[in-house]
Amino acid sequence: VDVGGESTRPGYTMISDEEEISRVVPVVEKIKAEFDIPISVDTYKSGVAKVAIDAGADLINDIWGFKYDENMAQVVKDGMHNRKEMDYTDYMNDVLNDLKESIAMAKAVGIDDNRICTDPGVGFAKTYEQNLEIINKLEMLNTLGYPVLLGTSKKSVIGLTLDLPSDERVEGTIATSVLAVVKNSLFVRVHNVKENKRAILMTEKILGKY
């Protein structure tokens, strides 16, 4: 379960660490008390990450991959691709190189390989066409040697493709989840868990993955 206290969609308004903590920590504590499942906290702020981990978070989902907050590498356990600019010279190679930099930063502070996964950051500093390309070429991330996570749930790339509002993007999300399985990604981050799980299980059965 991924818990976030601040929206990171395009045009979002930044909130203070204190406000974000007040939103996130009670939810983490409540989930941890009632369910035995891994909890991820979506934050790019090291102060929030530290408090979240103390509250029981198992993973930190940093959309900037350690590059926004210089202290984040000390606490983060999950990296994702994002950058401030959309100026890519060689799109896929730039994405891979950015992720390699984030991985190197994680390893430099002693984060074990088995605590790292890579996320191409669909919807972050990418055009519509680039988002489609990264999903289509998702298997290239496997060359980095780490599990791949795809997070496309209800994102604008689906809305723009199907001309649908966010609450009607379930089927589009499922399509990307199925493709993630085909491309050998180990994780997807979604809102509608039941529907996506069923589609993924069926896809895995067809592919002989279980």
Language-model region placement:
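N-terminal glycine-rich anion-binding loops that anchor highly charged ligand groups
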Residues: 1-5
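Active-site-adjacent loop and "lid" segments of alpha/beta metabolic enzymes
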Residues: 8-46, 53-54, 58-105, 109, ...
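Short acidic capping loops at alpha-helix termini that bridge into adjacent secondary structure
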Residues: 112-115
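Short strand-loop junctions, especially beta-strand C-caps/beta-turns
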Residues: 121-123
